[in-house]
UniProtKB/Swiss-Prot annotation:
GO terms for molecular function: rRNA binding; structural constituent of ribosome. Keywords: Ribonucleoprotein, Ribosomal protein, RNA-binding, rRNA-binding. The keyword Ribonucleoprotein applies. The keyword Ribosomal protein applies. Transmembrane segments: none annotated. One of its GO terms (cellular component) is ribosome. Binds directly to 23S ribosomal RNA and is necessary for the in vitro assembly process of the 50S ribosomal subunit. It is not involved in the protein synthesizing functions of that subunit. This is Large ribosomal subunit protein bL20.
Length: 127
């Protein structure tokens, strides 16, 4: 059986890891073992934070909608409840965009939601 020399592959693999760790501080960018650990952790953080970003944006949209709704004399909770009662399906991303860039359209949606809410919100629905 022929002898297999692995130096080229090993160097290529190590160079790829060290290039991926090039911006890190101290040993993490210079020593292979430390760089490999850090690159592995960085990929894990990257994956988890891509999932977390969705929740972060939803939280931001809700804060923006709530602030704009309160300027129009309503709370976020009542606004969403009123929009559902009026069968208006607008997601939070679009609502936040309207709240920031088109205050008149947002105010119109608040008005529609207010009219759709019953006078006593906690009263049971008439069947």
């Amino acid at each position: 059986m022929a002898r297999v020399k692995r130096a080229v592959n090993a160097h290529k693999k190590r160079r790829a890891i060290l290039e991926a760790a090039s911006g890190y501080r101290g040993q993490r960018s210079r020593l292979y073992r430390k760089a490999k650990e850090q690159v592995t952790h960085s990929l894990v953080y990257n994956y988890n934070d891509r999932k977390k970003r969705k929740g972060d944006f939803r939280q931001l949209w809700i804060q923006r909608i709530n602030a704009a709704a309160r300027q129009n004399g309503m709370t976020y909770n009542r606004l969403i409840q009123g929009l559902k009662a009026a069968n208006i399906e607008v997601d939070r991303k679009i609502l936040a965009e309207l709240a920031v860039n088109d205050a008149n359209a947002f105010a119109a949606l608040v008005e529609v939601a207010q009219k759709a809410l019953p006078s006593d919100v906690n009263a049971p629905k008439a069947a």
